[in-house]
């Protein structure tokens, strides 16, 4: 039996199995550096459950948010599991809270750094509850005033605002974002390329009506307004009062939304 293992072999075995470094090293020592034999031995001993679980889909999970007491820094995270049952598990929720607190306290801003920081705890939890668990994504938002909203732990919104702070209105805007899923705060946030592309598309559609250029231009303008009302927060009808836009509500209360982030379990963003 060998007493020293090449670090590259350990990394390769860990990559293929998701088992801890210590266990990978021991498995390679026991197999005299034969990685395939090490994997076989892991499977026989039950350690390979990590590998099996790590390849299973994780369609469920939770979105959670933590905002610092001064309301100027917050974090939203999505951690996935396989079933809704596990998403309600106290150990799973405690793991999420620990990840969030640590990320904020240690100013971790990179997803790979966060995954590395909690890999051992993740694997331990997987063995405890018997499901695959993945830290999918997180976002740190900094601003003058932060608010948030979570809908059934599956949709989360983190909002940064400034101006005359009205907590109720900002919370309602966060709820609106959860429901309507805008992509931008204002029209100025849309890139010129996107606007030009959409205008070309709408003009090509309008030309099929064979109208005068002036009428075609009005048709295109109307369609562009509709396009913006679908993706721009300030242009959308407010879910709390559909007779007004979000922008008009914000103007009335002298509030500015500087940025927002929206997560939904399983979306492609």
Swiss-Prot record:
Residues 83-86 are annotated as: Involved in Mg(2+) ion dislocation from EF-Tu. Coiled coil: none annotated. It holds the Pfam family EF_TS. GO terms for cellular component: cytoplasm. Keywords: Cytoplasm, Elongation factor, Protein biosynthesis. Its main location: cytoplasm. One of its GO terms (molecular function) is translation elongation factor activity. InterPro entries: EF-Ts_dimer_sf (IPR036402), Transl_elong_EFTs/EF1B (IPR001816), Transl_elong_EFTs/EF1B_dimer (IPR014039), Transl_elong_Ts_CS (IPR018101), UBA-like_sf (IPR009060). Belongs to the EF-Ts family. PANTHER family: ELONGATION FACTOR TS (PTHR11741), ELONGATION FACTOR TS, MITOCHONDRIAL (PTHR11741:SF0). This is Elongation factor Ts. It comes from Blochmanniella floridana.
């Amino acid at each position: 039996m060998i007493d020293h293992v090449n670090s590259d072999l350990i990394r390769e075995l860990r990559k293929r199995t998701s088992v801890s470094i210590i266990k990978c090293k021991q498995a390679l020592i026991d197999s005299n550096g034969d990685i395939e034999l090490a994997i076989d031995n892991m499977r026989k001993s039950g350690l390979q459950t990590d590998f099996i679980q790590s390849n299973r889909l994780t369609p469920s999970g939770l979105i959670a948010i933590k905002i610092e007491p001064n309301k100027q820094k917050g974090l939203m995270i999505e951690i996935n599991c396989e079933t809704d049952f596990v998403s309600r598990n106290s150990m799973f929720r405690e793991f999420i809270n620990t990840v969030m607190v640590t990320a904020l306290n240690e100013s971790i801003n990179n997803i790979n750094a966060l995954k590395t920081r909690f890999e051992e705890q993740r694997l331990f939890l997987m063995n405890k509850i018997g499901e695959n668990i993945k830290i999918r994504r997180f976002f740190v938002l900094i601003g003058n005033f932060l608010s948030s909203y979570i809908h059934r732990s599956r949709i989360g919104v983190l909002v940064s605002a400034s101006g005359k702070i009205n907590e109720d209105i900002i919370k309602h805007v966060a709820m609106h974002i959860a429901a309507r899923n805008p992509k931008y705060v204002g029209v100025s946030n849309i890139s010129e390329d996107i606007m030009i592309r959409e205008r070309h598309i709408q003009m090509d559609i309008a030309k099929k009506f064979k109208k005068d250029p002036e009428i075609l231009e009005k048709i295109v303008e109307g369609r562009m307004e509709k396009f913006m009302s679908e993706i721009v927060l300030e242009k959308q009808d407010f879910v709390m009062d559909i007779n007004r836009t979000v922008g008009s509500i914000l103007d009335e209360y002298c509030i500015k939304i500087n940025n927002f982030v929206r997560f939904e379990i399983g979306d492609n963003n």
